[in-house]
Amino acid sequence: MRKTAAVLGFGFVLILTASACRKPAEAAKAEDLISGIGLTRLEVYGQRPAPDGLQSGSPHVHAVTDEGYYVMSGSGRVELHDLKQGFRTIEMTPGRYLQFPPGVLHRLVNEDHLTILVVMGNAGLAEKGDARIYFGQAVDENQAEFARLVGLAKAEGLEGALKRRDEAVRAYQSLLALWTSDRDAYNRELRRFIDVHMKAASERRADFLQAVETGPVAWGNRFKQRLAALPLSPDDLSPAIHLPPDEPTLGMCGLLRPVIKMDPADRDR
């Protein structure tokens, strides 16, 4: 088995471009992905089943960022939970695209080598605390244990990432059981978890705002500048290219090959 590089934090999409290091007033640069999005190739974990017998990623939620899945190959499904509609599943086959807003707890299930192109708004927020894995109430109330579980991928590599997934799925099985047996209790637990994450995310508002201003907001300003400059040529940006890494990183849902570094496309490659 090839070695994989563990990622810091949650990092479902793990896009951190140069935008995160710029002052908010600066415009987006050529090496940033269009409109400040995050983009990654995801191979959903399939090394061994989770405690419920399914090959899957870790159930988790985002605080302020929308997410989209475009199926490149294979098949599987997405399990969704939100406060309006509760639990439902969406089948995922090649060519299908699913998009959902923040506040939706979700888990990817791999049925046959599911490979997805993941698109996220607000590149870089995943590392800053926008995502939270569901480990249940007991872990949410124990910060040391939560930090230990989150850090398993960094500490133990692929096996650690799978252990983290397993702990999440054990708690998640209880949530699914509530959907069947006690819908009111299910709604209370889902709301509790989302509220815990939203409160934690609110403490990082300044970091989130900087990432938004140096990513999508900066790109929006650039588009306005191009419109105002017409009929002059838009700006001095040049084509840029990303070359995929040799080894994947370990995300919440699987093996990731994120678009992180963009280089000038000024020669044949």
PLM regions and their residue ranges:
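Bacterial Sec-dependent signal peptides at the C-terminal "C-region" and cleavage site
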Residues: T4, L8-A28
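Conserved short histidine dyad/triad with adjacent acidic residue
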Residues: R41-A63
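His/acidic/aromatic-lined binding-pocket segments of jelly-roll/cupin-type domains
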Residues: P59-V61, D66-V71, T89-I90, L98, ...
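Short, conserved beta-strand element in jelly-roll/cupin
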Residues: A63-V78, D82, V119-G121
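Short acidic-glycine-tyrosine-enriched beta hairpin
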Residues: D82-P102
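Double-stranded beta-helix
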Residues: H113-R183
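An accessory alpha-helical subdomain
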Residues: A155-P231
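C-terminal non-catalytic accessory extensions
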Residues: A206-R269
